[in-house]
Amino acid sequence: MAIIFNPNKKIFTLQTAHTTYQMQVDRLGYLLHLYYGAKSTCDMDYVLTYADRGFSGNPYAAGMNRTYSLDTLPQEYPTLGTGDFRNIALDIKNEQGTESVELLYKSHEIRDGKYALKGLPAVWASDDEAQTLEIVLGDDIAGVEVHLLYGVLEACDVITRSVFIKNTGSGNITIEKAHAACLDIVYGDYDVIRFYGKHAMERNLERTRLGHGTLSFGSRRGTSSHQYNPAVILAQRDTTENAGDCYGMLFVYSGNFSCEAEKDQINQTRLLMGLSDELFSYPLAAGETFTVPEVIMSYSADGFSQLSHQYHTCISEHVCRSRFAHEVRPVLINSWEAAYFDFTGDTIVDLAKEAASLGIDMVVMDDGWFGKRDDDNSSLGDWFVNEKKLGGTLSELIDRVHAQGVKFGIWIEPEMVNEDSNLYREHPDWAIQIPGKLPVRSRNQLLLDFSRKEVRDNIFNQICAVFDQGKIDYVKWDMNRSMADVYAGNLAYDYVLGVYDFMERLVTRYPDILLEGCSGGGGRFDAGMLYYSPQIWCSDNTDAINRTRIQYGTSFFYPVSSMGAHVSAVPNHQTGRVTSLKTRGITAMAGTFGYELNPALLSDEEKEEIREQIKTFKKYEMLINEGTYWRLTSPFEDEVAAWMSVSRAKDRALVSVVRLYAEANAAACYVKLKGLESDAVYIEENTGRQYTGAALMNAGIPLPFAVKEYEAYQFSFIRLDEAKKLYDEIKKVCGNLKSGEADSTDSASDKRIVISIYGGSGSGKTTIAAALQQYFLNDNTACYVLTGDNYPHRIPMRNDEERLNVYNESGEDGLRGYLGTPKEIDFDRINKELSEFKEGKDIIEIKHMGREDGDISYDETDFTGIKVLILEWTHGGSEYLKGVDIPVFLESSPEETKARRIKRGRDENAASPFICRVVELEQEKLDLQGKNARIVVGKDGKVYEQ
């Protein structure tokens, strides 16, 4: 069980996979916080200390005990008016203006499954994935009952918290402050990490030492805002990406919020998160209830990366509900930066044609398709299609776009109204404004009062009438201003609930529409929005270099799959910066990936580069979106921005690096990777170079020296699973080969083993042999790789000439009798070397052959201590070859061999008809020799013994 109650001590213990959260109902009925941190099975009530501290009052129920004070004890949900003079979580005012609620324990319930919040987004889970603890506290005199809700998702290492408040009295009360979570820590010296910003530059990381007093931030803008994200990390001073204690809080809410971190008089720390108490005063009549939105809490003892992974898993698995959350999503192109308001239906169709030719999946028609909207001064609220501008109906346009083989998306801004609109002229009172005062304009628009159902219904019906005109595949929901004219204390909260109601109705009616959130970019990038839309436009700033910072900060809580990121034109429309198409593409691949540009203005070379970009993204899309995301550097501190995605199985990894500035005579730059298997062997796809996971993580990879500013690189690593499987199979076949571990027959330590790896040209022999060697070395077994390419009678160029001569003189039968026989191969030489190795000779002359005439040498090689010789060679299964203990056959086909040879690019005639026929004849022999192999590596990667 994830939740345990000790009735003797009245201790609640909440256990996740790696953390423990504990609290206790004390003898006076107060709910005290005991512990949150690394997993523990101990009752932690011993951490409570009691001391008589001047001016820290004592509850009357404590009698004459001056050491008991709520001003110093760690509390689970502190309230105003109880003698706790620190920041509090709850403040309720009664009709007389008294602000005092003393919450005492009444009851609790533990149940399977995760609680839900009516009208609010919240983490969801099945009954076997989560448990709920509901603790009821109350103040009978004040007539208030508070239900503390805890959701425990054991596998995710997260605990959610929400609060349900009920007026149980006969009079009215007003909630003046309501936070969802409080965390009291009795020890430690902490930093606060918050994510500040502005429009077009959101979620910049700022780490501040928490001194005495309060550090607070939040939003009073009606949205979670560009300026501060509703997320916070409390970290010990020495915490880094990879080590140290840190706590996270993430508010699942899209409106006004507040976060308060306080270090008190005796160096205790209190962290609070919930609704902002500014512009908030919520009335409750007798019997009415109020729900505080949810906070997701998590703890990591292993630094920020692990904390991020826990949040990423929680959001992608238990917040996002869209069917698109784990699906391949379309690569889109948006009309905004391509045309802004200046477009027609033909413009959109032309964009679709260009998109199709580039491999783009979807065209999105952005702002300007409705009412009479040719600029941002009119028509918001009039959600009817401007058929004159589009040159026909929306249905016709959608069909024309779909006819190009691409999907169709559309932009909306349901919460807004222009004064120059039919809606405003008919219902001016539907716009939010303070009675008797003129409203505050922003972007020449006003905010509709979505706290009112009749307003929501009108807009919803208008939007549905548009969506029902054709198959719309995607919708971008925008929101381009803050709330200023707050006419009542309940407005800001009720407005957000109205938005959620609208979104719930929309996604329920149109489950097959991919919904992307937006608020001037990342002004409402929060977990509340992700409950309805699986992705959010990360920022209106598409500059690749700025985006490395924006996406870096975003990644601390939100998964890559949630970040809308596009390649835009240069000079960039926000910064004027020029970066290469490659750099822009690599940066945008750390998100949902798409384009914000006019393809008609691109050169043929740029278009071809975009085609290749899209192929690359689609190749790695699920690795990027579903893999584990690692931050490798900080773009705020380092000369490069680097990040990587690692598959859950750790068998694939994609590393991306962007240089942030250039420097003359620069030092070499290395990037250390993360999240790989230390002992595994990985091959880098582009170079064919092999590394162990330990080498990549501890030494890193050197970057090419910069030729120009803002260069970017990608490295793709694949774990050589066939080599590991082969190694395990070989160990079973030949027993323990470790040096110095002889058995009674001395066959283990003294006997030398010869393994041949053979298969068609380009079948991966060299790769498998090198990886196999590394696995032997990992196991402390000395191993040598010998290549069979050194043993033809002639250098490769002359050998191909001789093959052609044989064919011309004797035909195909003659060629068949030449290939792989002593006529072509110096079997005597290689058999001599293998024989000397097996006899135990330590110094052996090994033949080496180059690619030029006369480039043949015999080099003395020291085999002292070497127990295994791996021969990698096309003819490693030949009947003429002697001394092989374990022949290993790599299955392949002539078609695969041809493709690999061409890709390898080593032989200029690899695709010639003659060479292709040679490969086919060699394959005939290989197929026969393969039947004599001891071990076979199949085309499907399976390894088995024959």
List where the protein language model places each region.
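Polysaccharide-binding surfaces and accessory modules of carbohydrate-active proteins
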Residues: 5, 10-13, 17, 21, ...
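Carbohydrate-binding surface patches
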Residues: 241, 634-677
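Aromatic-lined carbohydrate-binding/catalytic grooves of carbohydrate-active enzymes
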Residues: 324-461, 474
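Active-site neighborhood of glycoside hydrolase catalytic domains
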Residues: 389-393, 425-582, 592-597, 601
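C-terminal beta-strand-rich structural cap/linker in extracellular carbohydrate-active enzymes
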Residues: 693-722
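Conserved nucleotide-sensing/catalytic segment adjacent to the nucleotide-binding pocket
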Residues: 784, 793-852
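ATP-dependent NMP and nucleoside kinases share a basic, alpha-helical "lid"
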Residues: 856-904
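Small-molecule kinase domains that catalyze NTP-dependent phosphoryl transfer to phosphate-bearing small molecules
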Residues: 906-946
